[in-house]
């Protein structure tokens, strides 16, 4: 009896094994969207909780979640912070794994009110789902008791999402380095001996400990001003984040930072009005140097006097803080920025002017280099408006300008070993110019032929017509969307391969762009029984699909070529 049971188990296992062995390599192993992202909601009067159970190996994009009420009014939606995910085409994005809860406050809802919830996610294996839309029916509630119930969800959300502070170390490190770099610009460095003497109250003989204490207090006073500024901007940034998505705002900010960068190049001077600077200077002069209280006030006032060299970098940091809307990030980043500016002052005060580099043209070079750093911000902002292709050309132009300037500047250096640096800078400039060269003179023949010539279709009727017009040739239908990372990988790495192109030489190539996910896109996907993208379908000469040849998920050129050969008669 035991032997028969064992034999039966072995038969079942072998059946499963052979089924997997002969399973088509392109067959979908992905679950439907409702199983990958199980959505649910609960409403208790004014409290509404939206929840997702995310399957292992899948994730939701934070930026793709939208919540729109109909015949109802809800409090401001604050999405929890996610974890960072990075890919080649979209850079860094925040995503949610495992479980996501979004508590909401329904201020009031009429009879028949609804909430439209849209979300979109992908699988780690390289498969993305179209945006899903769910309609949440709301119970009728009045606005009478909303004031009492409003604070609880915000508090709960704050407890669940302490993660933004975790991003502080990397950002703070850059702020610290920028502060140190600003200290060596021509507007700041020559002032340090004078500031050092004022801080010490003109007393030349002070113990090292006393001098260190007074200078540190001065720097803390300066840091207090910057930290307060960071907190204010971060608080205002909570309302600023939505505005940053508007093209006109992005273009306006790009123009502002371009002007700030030009000020770093010396085209004009940007500083506080002279009357205000004079008042602040007089207030600072009334303080008594050499005393902790007076030194602290002097430092706080000094933080208000923005020199021409500090205005542009400070504005760039403030934009970053405003975009984050994070109070800890805002205060901490500017505190360390001020600390970076103060470190050289502490060293000079304690160890004397012998540590101070000699003034010279190199300080102007530092200021100009910061101008190029500031110019990166307009490119970053405009890239969201003009798209990746033109964004790459702007980055290319900025790279050529920076490396070209650095190369020309290095020609005046007389130090040994600069020849190697010059070669590296020249090579970097030549590499940076490539996208501009392709744009101005056209890509090479090989590059021009690097993409397959797809015929676009948009509807089920257009697909049926294209299948009828194939004239006895096999057909390949590629389903594409801009939000599909693996679709872009197919374009760059698979469809550009000469072997793949040669194999598809006699195949009619169709492509449906379902980025908009509108009604006709949804109808097409439903007609083809497609769960998500990338999905590639193959039809025979009679217009019938080969179901076992369907591809879901990314394939590299070698694997895809083998798949194409296997489906050939």
From Swiss-Prot:
Residues 430-569 form the Thioredoxin domain. GO terms for biological process: cell redox homeostasis; cytochrome complex assembly. It catalyses: [protein]-dithiol + NAD(+) = [protein]-disulfide + NADH + H(+); [protein]-dithiol + NADP(+) = [protein]-disulfide + NADPH + H(+). The chain crosses the membrane at residues 168-188, 213-233, 248-268, 301-321, 328-348, 362-382, 391-411. It is found in: Cell inner membrane. It is a multi-pass membrane protein. The keyword Disulfide bond applies. It comes from the Bacteria. Its EC number is 1.8.1.8. Its main location: membrane. GO terms for molecular function: electron transfer activity; protein-disulfide reductase [NAD(P)H] activity. Pfam families: DsbD_N (PF11412), DsbD_TM (PF02683), Thioredoxin_7 (PF13899). Residues 1-19 form the signal peptide. CDD domains: DsbDgamma. Keywords: Cell inner membrane, Cell membrane, Cytochrome c-type biogenesis, Disulfide bond, Electron transport, Membrane, NAD, Oxidoreductase, Redox-active center, Signal, Transmembrane, Transmembrane helix, Transport. Disulfide bonds join 122-128, 187-309, 484-487. GO terms for cellular component: plasma membrane. PANTHER family: THIOL:DISULFIDE INTERCHANGE PROTEIN DSBD. Required to facilitate the formation of correct disulfide bonds in some periplasmic proteins and for the assembly of the periplasmic c-type cytochromes. Acts by transferring electrons from cytoplasmic thioredoxin to the periplasm. This transfer involves a cascade of disulfide bond formation and reduction steps. NCBIfam families: PRK00293.1 (NF001419). Belongs to the thioredoxin family. DsbD subfamily. This is Thiol:disulfide interchange protein DsbD. It comes from Citrobacter koseri (strain ATCC BAA-895 / CDC 4225-83 / SGSC4696).
